């Protein structure tokens, strides 16, 4: 299949997003869509110039192929649209399998640690100077490492393959790296035998080698009698690895057997992390035939994998993706190995079917913590099932059910109570937002004086930037109604805007942009946050570029833009006459009148993201 136009559904997720970026690197015209936005993956898509379009055909694109997350179910409006256009629809795994079918493919599979091990293989190959492509199932902590990359000059591609939806059956790898295997996904597989059969068939389709951890009885049984070599990794494996030293953040590994005899230092600690690193080094050696002196020198970890969000003497707050009893048990062992003090876990079960299947195992795994708080189940679109609620996890134990997440911060504060502790937020749902909120809370509590906006921006704003407290908003609207803004700013430069938005993020402070305030209703009790106003004198400049083109600032008033266009002899702007407001606001809502729309006259847009990055895209990248 040659490169063409593709529409990726569920593009802000950790499975589809990286694949979209990989396809873009291969030369495809890629657009995406997701019902849920705000994911960190959205920034990666923007960096790769992949627009989110509700209807790519309406934007002038003609995707003949649609890739979808398995979470996008039949009957979804986007799928119905794709089918009505005659597009071919593939699940994420099926599409990835087609793209790597003619490549030398390294498949990373297993129940736990796929993303971490895959990321470590990428880091090890990068450290060895290898040329290759990859597709991760998450985000690197290192912002310089994108979640996917295509290589036009190398046949090698590394990616994790997902067993949860059966698409693992579409792959025929050169090298298969099986990190482990436990019973999981009872919503898809009838029993363990079904799951094992899928992995056995994958091993049988593998063309060069299968890599497994030494001593794993289940994987030994499933790889018995294969026609390709089975390479074992561990203290007694073909690739011998033995930890000989280390601390809470690093490990010294002694390598031997199929490895060159040497010692290497890797930036990981704990039994599970060392095992993942060993598997990654073995896979990199199979591909390159060598081991770099600093094999994981680029390794900074994976987001939501033992991700430390806050730390001060006596308290550490972290988030982890663990959502299976084995993963939780491994995480808690790592916490005991690398942290002193009490271990407090906040667990959000993922999917009702998994919760029902493993309620007792979750209860047992959580018992390794000093305290366990259990949140309501994150359904991931599943309907509730009997016995699939969080109540089944806490039943008959000392674990505490937190039914209202608003009560969580006070519950944690009472448990921490000035004693040395680590607080781990655990789960594959949206518990990360609770973790980030609690980390922000601790940063505020830890300050000698609770800071407010002026404290964080002092000395960092331009002299021309206005920042005022308790600003009346009634005079900022055409209706002349409403209360005051807690903070009001008129930034003079892009740097001013970035500084203000980052301070709001640190303070967990809401913000809102007001233009002319046309038909804007402000509550009588005002706005408890920051109101930003882009004054037209600084942000409304209009520059003629010739050939019927204008460069216009977002603060320009539409009436003035229409008048200037008339003076320049430019047609097509007449519909703007009589529309109140500024250009920025009109772009936000695709303002129009008399059969004309603002995007009819737009060539491209440059804007600032909430994270402070300057973005630019052409008209067909917008869902307008």
Where are these regions (language model features)?
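Anion-binding (especially nucleotide phosphate/pyrophosphate-binding) glycine-rich loop
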Residues: 452-583
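Residue-level signal for inorganic ion chemistry
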Residues: 23, 66, 108, 132, ...
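Phosphate-binding loop of NTP-binding sites
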Residues: 22-25, 70, 74-214, 218-229, ...
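ATP-dependent carboxylate-amine ligase
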Residues: 1-52, 62-66, 74, 84-87, ...
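A gly/ser-rich beta-alpha-beta helix-loop segment of oxidoreductase catalytic cores
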Residues: 109, 562-568, 572-603, 609
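Structural signature of FAD isoalloxazine-binding scaffolds in flavoprotein oxidoreductases
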Residues: 489-494, 521-539, 588-618
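Glycine-rich beta-strand-to-loop/alpha-helix junction loops that act as flexible
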Residues: 69-71, 214, 425-430, 514-518, ...
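Short beta-strand "acidic-cap" motif of Rossmann-like dinucleotide-binding folds
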Residues: 29-34, 133-134, 232, 513, ...
